[in-house]
Swiss-Prot record:
Co-factor remark: Binds 1 Mg(2+) ion per subunit.
Gene Ontology biological process terms, A to Z: killing of cells of another organism; lipid catabolic process
Binding-site residues, Mg(2+): E25, D27, D85
Listed cofactors: Mg(2+)
Cross-referenced SUPFAM superfamilies: PLC-like phosphodiesterases (SSF51695)
Protein name: Dermonecrotic toxin LhSicTox-alphaIV1ii
Catalytic activity: an N-(acyl)-sphingosylphosphocholine = an N-(acyl)-sphingosyl-1,3-cyclic phosphate + choline; an N-(acyl)-sphingosylphosphoethanolamine = an N-(acyl)-sphingosyl-1,3-cyclic phosphate + ethanolamine; a 1-acyl-sn-glycero-3-phosphocholine = a 1-acyl-sn-glycero-2,3-cyclic phosphate + choline; a 1-acyl-sn-glycero-3-phosphoethanolamine = a 1-acyl-sn-glycero-2,3-cyclic phosphate + ethanolamine
CDD domains: GDPD_like_SMaseD_PLD (cd08576)
Family, per entry: Belongs to the arthropod phospholipase D family. Class II subfamily.
Organism field: Loxosceles hirsuta
């Protein structure tokens, strides 16, 4: 999976997919009432990127729906997976549940069109703070209450704070997410700091958890990877996805002889919740 990083304006969806992304990551900020408000990152952000692109959340979700709805003039068949980087820093552990509920309602209305022929992409809810696990509980509750529990089959989960894997598993379980129930595990650091500085130790631990008989992880992705050498290192470590500002770099690496016969770009027909067995 090539995950286009920080796609916060609608026009960027085409820009990143044109460069080779089959997945995008979008930042979601919340107002004082725990309501998702903008697709917006703000400063600081990755080097060589403009931090202030934004849309109102409803506008962005409408654009995203069109990009992932077959038959729409804006449809991009390559775009199969969307990571919502939920900026829950302004939520407390007590308002996280409300934030999740409201976000679930918003996705149902603006992305899934009330469950009637909405966007088809798979969704990952990515939360930076383990203490905000109730966001997931609230989100699930909103879809169940609305009578659309079936849409949860399109939703996966990630905690992005580089926490201890055991603690991450506990937080997921507290949110009612079973082991390997559509779980992605991210690991990474801003591109302003070399990924060599962070190293791949935790990535490798996540990969071995994924591949063990008693792990909790379905897939592993590494962020934010823009340099050729770092992409190769991540692929050699066994990741399923790479989040990047430069999707074309990942495409070029995948076309190298070492990887060409081994790896290919995922399509919509590849289930992003199934652990890949080469």
């Amino acid at each position: 999976w090539i995950m286009g990083h920080m796609v916060n304006e609608i026009y960027q969806i085409d820009e990143f997919v044109d460069l080779g992304a089959n997945s995008i990551e979008t930042d979601i900020t919340f107002d004082d009432n725990a309501m998702a408000e903008y697709s917006f990152h703000g400063v600081p952000c990755d080097c060589r990127r403009y931090c202030h692109k934004w849309e109102y959340i409803n506008t962005f979700l409408d654009g995203l729906r069109r990009a992932t709805t077959p038959g729409d003039s804006k449809f991009r068949k390559e775009l199969a997976l969307v990571v919502f980087d939920l900026k829950t820093g302004d939520l407390s552990s007590s308002t996280a549940n409300k934030g999740g509920k409201l976000f679930g309602q918003k996705l149902l209305q603006h992305y899934w069109k009330g469950g009637n022929n909405g966007g088809r992409a798979y969704i990952i809810l990515s939360i930076p703070d383990l203490d905000h696990y109730a966001f997931i509980s609230g989100f699930k509750e909103a879809l169940k209450t609305a009578g659309h529990e079936e849409l949860l089959a399109k939703v996966g989960y990630d905690f992005s704070g580089n926490d201890d894997l055991g603690s991450t598993r506990t937080a997921l379980n507290k949110a009612g997410v079973k082991d390997r129930e559509r779980v992605w595990q991210s690991d990474g650091i801003t591109n302003c700091v070399s990924t060599l500085f962070r190293g791949l130790d935790r990535v490798k631990k996540a990969v071995s958890n994924r591949d063990s008989s008693n792990g909790y992880i379905n897939k592993v992705y590494h962020w934010t990877v823009d340099k050729y050498g770092s992409v190769r290192d991540a692929l050699d470590a066994g990741v399923d996805g790479v989040m990047t500002n430069d999707p074309d770099v990942i495409v070029n690496v995948l076309n190298e002889s070492k990887y060409k016969g081994k790896l290919r770009l995922a399509t919509y027909d590849d289930n992003p919740w199934e652990t890949f067995k080469p």
